Amino acid sequence: MDIGILSSLKPAQSFRDNSLGSFINSIDYSDSGEYVATTCSADDTVQIYDALDPKQVHTITCFETGIEVARFTHHDHNLLLSTTKGNKDIQYVSIYDNKRISYFSGHTDIVSSIEVSPIEDQFVSTANDKTLKLWKMNQSSRCLGNLDLPSLGIPAYDPTGLVFAVACHSLSRIFLYDVRNYGSDPFSTFTIDDSRYLSRFSFPPMMPEWKHMEFSNDGKCILLSTRANVHYILDAFSGDVLSRLEDFQELPFSNNFHGGSTTFVPQGNFVIGSADDRTLNVWNLRHTFHHKGKTRPPEHRIVSQSIINPGLVKYNPRYDQLLTAGSQLVFWLPEKYALTS
């Protein structure tokens, strides 16, 4: 992957299967990179798309339970869905026959995040009840572990699947846990302090609200996305701020988005993220460990009149394809493959 390919990304296909005036809440790729799932809370629907030949292929209606977040399991035709009505279960759903396989009960408020282990049929969930729960997909009767958090948590697995992290913005801390010893205290805690930089904008300095967290494919870095015009690349072993990814646009997106306005590009040392209404930024992370604390402006900006409010961004784990979502869903391809601009 190089900047030439990323800078040539063009909208190839767009969809608006959600109602007029509504926004897509969450997006996810299947492990194979062949399918996409989106949710729209306003419509109580989950849409499934073929990613390789972009088209809508299935709709799951959730009128009785509501819908917040959808995440693929390790099977292309199975999803985990968080509900907004009733007892706030997580549902394990078969897309193929639209059946609920099992229910994961325990959260007392809406589940805001679901992250699936990269190596096994296990997942973590965080909810507005300020808890994190660890689950086995074949054991829905009770969770494997429960953590009480000081505030809403943002979870992420490292690429080995042996560690999960949970970020708590209210404390400006990230806690790291050993999956094999989840009942113990975190084995590492990072306090994220960028007061010197942030004091340029407010006093006392205010850390922008955190929105999303993910590990790089090599496990060395953590991407911490915020709701403001700066995001962070952290050392995954020390918590040090390696880079600030700076933009000069405030992001006026809905508080109901579940995901990040930035994401790692799996095949290279780049981060791509949304900027203003019709713009994406590309940051180059080259020499990140040699220039710690460096503020990085975007190396390239992608502007297209075909996108509106790209509040969610996700890169295909298997193919050179980007997904953005806001009031519409857009599939992006390098220019030589894109059908439209």
From Swiss-Prot:
It comes from the Eukaryota. InterPro entries: Swd2/WDR82, WD40/YVTN_repeat-like_dom_sf, WD40_repeat_dom_sf, WD40_rpt. GO terms for biological process: co-transcriptional mRNA 3'-end processing, cleavage and polyadenylation pathway; regulation of pericentric heterochromatin formation; regulation of siRNA-independent facultative heterochromatin formation. GO terms for cellular component: chromatin; cytosol; DPS complex; mRNA cleavage and polyadenylation specificity factor complex; nucleus. Keywords: Cytoplasm, Nucleus, Repeat, WD repeat. WD repeats lie at residues 19-59, 106-145, 252-293, 303-341. PANTHER family: WD REPEAT PROTEIN, WD40 REPEAT PROTEIN SWD2. This is Uncharacterized WD repeat-containing protein C824.04. It comes from Schizosaccharomyces pombe (strain 972 / ATCC 24843) (Fission yeast).
